[in-house]
Design a protein with these regions (language model features):
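Beta1-alpha1 glycine-rich phosphate/pyrophosphate-binding loop at the start
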Residues: 1-39, 63-66, 112-150, 154-159, ...
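FAD-site-proximal beta/loop scaffold in flavoenzymes
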Residues: 71-96, 158, 178-257, 291
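Mid-to-C-terminal Rossmann-like scaffold of FAD/NAD(P)H-dependent oxidoreductases
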Residues: 144, 154-164, 262, 269-344, ...
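Hydrophobic/small residue at the entry helix of a nucleotide-binding pocket
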Residues: 2, 106, 248
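Glycine/serine-rich phosphate-binding loop and adjoining beta1-alpha1 elements at the start
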Residues: 28, 36, 43-84, 333-346, ...
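Glycine-rich dinucleotide-binding loop and its adjacent helix/turn
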Residues: 20, 25-37, 62-117, 222-236
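Feature captures the FAD/FMN-dependent oxidoreductase FAD-binding
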Residues: 21-67, 157-165, 169, 176-177, ...
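A conserved FAD-binding loop/helix module that cradles the flavin
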Residues: 243-277
Length: 378
């Protein structure tokens, strides 16, 4: 399916499918030809068919820790489980209780997706509670939804009996350090803390990789992590470029979109263009009647209302309610690219951005407030 992790990985409660598919259709309607179910094993061979090739394969392969018992059939990677969940497949094969190893954003995606299927989840990680990699929203919302977080655990083995997973053997870690140069982890274990967390299956959310190193000769140089070696998106092979998570590792959707624009500019220059891909919009005269809010560039963000946890786990819908008309108007008033922007003086000193700093605007005739909301009176 087109869309990569947006349609086969990121949970629907975080990114509704309908909007993504609509965007994909816009792209197809513009004349882009998509070929699916075609495995590319040699980028250099593909280059013979085209003027340029872009490798944007993402990081769709999940990593597993080399634990005893990791080869049991009830052991999975986060990418496998998230793909099945996104496709609304039956997840009963996971059993009633699951241990998820890794408490980053992906680990929380798995845990919260399984909670919505009525599956109990123990989310475990080596990091202490204050060092967890997931953002605070995930941690708070996950706790509200029933995710059992077990931080500061080191993993010894996946236990099994009669060919089935029965639990995850761990011990408590008081502290740990990671040496980036050697990849070694040094831990201080709590004596006598070894225990087994009972579970029916184990899911690794311990990192992802491109999978390009699995091919005998993909045609471009890869670094030690299996990512393409690039310089301004150019790989080691002439006319072959790389972008997105395939060079940065897992990131945000908006970062991948930014990568797409940057590599498009690089490819355009390679093909003889100037690399300029920005749209030139029709010049319009500023409309003073839209109203002026003093210091509108520093108005706080209007936060969306979070649905109650009991309501959230009962479906896969967006966890946030939509803005009310008033809230939408307040948030839109913060736009820094509206017609009014052309009549605002730019900041000259960084100190202007500090608390208490003032933003001076040019005097405009016949101005009236865009909002009467007390929240914007300041």
């Amino acid at each position: 399916q087109l869309g990569g992790p947006m349609t086969s990985g990121i949970p629907a409660y975080r990114l509704p499918l309908e909007g993504v598919m609509q965007e994909i259709q816009y792209i197809l309607d513009s004349g882009v030809k998509a070929e699916v179910n075609r495995e590319i094993t040699d980028a250099a061979a593909l280059k013979k068919e085209y003027d340029a090739v872009l490798v944007a394969v993402g990081v769709s392969k999940g990593k597993r820790l080399p634990l005893p018992g990791a080869d049991l059939p009830q052991v999975y990677t986060a990418m496998d489980v998230l793909a099945d969940s996104r496709a609304e497949k039956d997840l009963s094969y996971l059993g009633k209780t699951v241990c998820v190893i890794g408490a980053g954003s992906v680990g929380y995606d798995v845990a919260r997706s399984l909670i919505r299927k009525g599956i109990a989840v123990h989310l475990t990680c080596l990091e202490q509670a204050d060092k967890i990699l997931a953002d605070m929203d995930d941690q708070t919302e996950g706790a509200q939804e029933g995710v059992d977080l077990l931080p500061g655990r080191a993993f010894e083995a996946i236990e099994g009996a009669e060919g089935r997973v029965t639990g995850l053997r761990v011990h408590t870690v008081l502290s740990s350090t990671y040496d980036k140069a050697t990849g070694q982890i040094t831990e201080v274990a709590q004596e006598g803390s070894q225990t087994v967390i009972p579970c029916d299956s184990v899911v690794f959310a311990t990192g992802q990789y491109t999978g390009l190193q699995d091919y005998e000769n993909f045609g471009i140089e890869l670094n030690g992590r299996g990512f393409p070696e690039v310089e301004e998106h150019r790989t080691s092979a002439d006319g072959i470029f790389a972008a997105g998570d395939a060079i940065t590792g897992i990131s945000f959707v908006i970062k991948a979109i930014q990568q797409g624009r940057l590599v498009t500019s690089a490819i355009d220059r390679y093909l003889g263009g100037d690399g300029q891909i920005d749209e030139t919009l029709v010049e319009r005269t500023a409309q003073p009647e839209i109203g002026c809010i003093e210091h509108f560039g520093q108005l706080p963000r209007v936060e969306q209302e979070l649905r109650p946890a009991a309501e959230r786990i009962a479906d896969n819908d967006d966890v946030y309610r939509t803005y009310s008309c008033q809230e939408a108007g307040c948030e839109a008033s913060r736009c820094l690219q509206c017609d009014l922007r052309t009549q605002i003086q730019p900041m000259r000193l960084w100190s202007k951005f500090l608390p208490g700093g003032r933003v001076r605007s040019l005097p405009l005739p016949a101005m009236r407030p865009a909002h009467t909301d007390p929240a914007h009176a300041a």
